[in-house]
Amino acid sequence: MSLFDLTGKNAVVMGGGGGIGRALAKGFAENGAKVLLADIAEEPLKAAAADIGADVPYKVTNATQEAEVEALVKFAVEKLGKITILLNAQGFNKKFDALDFDMDSFRAMLDANITSLMMTSKYFGRHFKENNYGKIISLSSVRGRIATKANGNAAYCATKGAVDMLTKSLAAEYGPFGVTVNAIGPNIVPTPAMVAIFEMRAKENNVTVDEYIKMQGAGIPLRRIGTAEDLVGTAVFLASAASDYMTGCTLYPDGGLTAIG
């Protein structure tokens, strides 16, 4: 069996209806894993499940709500059997002026980007402990490591920095019962939400969206922004036996941005 083969593995993908979660779930499935998708909205889940395979189960879940996460674990075990992989790809980015922001919106980002990860890691962590095995992979960002000159990113950067430290802390805590905890820190990825931001920024700069995307890629060593598919190899590695002795790490498939940041 290949080091990267996921045959016999069962993965729950949080944020499975989003651009990145969907791509990574598809990558898991293509490498042999059975997957179950969870997200806060049903329509994107339906579309993602149909894209991956007709038999892919899904469950609408608000990962900030404890009872819903607990129910998701039970549902996932009923559908797939023993869960071996948890991918935390939930969360969102919204611009906040650090001198003028709404606390309710800020708390919503904290809940989506970090509280939900604590919640899923708690309940799936218990399941992993019972089985003495598990892989937790969380979606961080280069913005958890390096700031950006653009205004409005303080809240997002703070939540992604928290993801990195949660990853390290859980790795230390969960390691004794055979669970690895790692994260992926991508650069800009053109998800539907990011495309909306590109359109806004392009208009502000009086350029086309394609021109704006090229401008963003110009400062990256590989001279382009990434895609969700660029993250699949890293995710499969972290979900597979190839990474069994790696824990507490954030890996950066970012085109080299953190090398110069």
Residue ranges and their predicted role:
Residues 2-5, 224, 236, 247-261:
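Short C-terminal tail/terminal secondary-structure segment
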Residues 5-36:
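Canonical Rossmann dinucleotide-binding motif of NAD(H)/NADP(H)-dependent dehydrogenases/reductases
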Residues 97-98, 102-110, 216-217:
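Substrate-binding pocket helix/loop in short-chain dehydrogenase/reductase
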Residues 175, 180, 246-248:
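Short, small/polar-rich loop/turn modules that mediate ligand/substrate recognition or access, typified
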Residues 121, 159, 167:
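Active-site helix of classical SDR
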Residues 89-94, 256:
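Conserved NAD(P)H cofactor-binding loop of Rossmann-fold oxidoreductase domains
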Residues 126, 172-173, 244:
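Alpha-helical segment proximal to the catalytic Tyr-Lys
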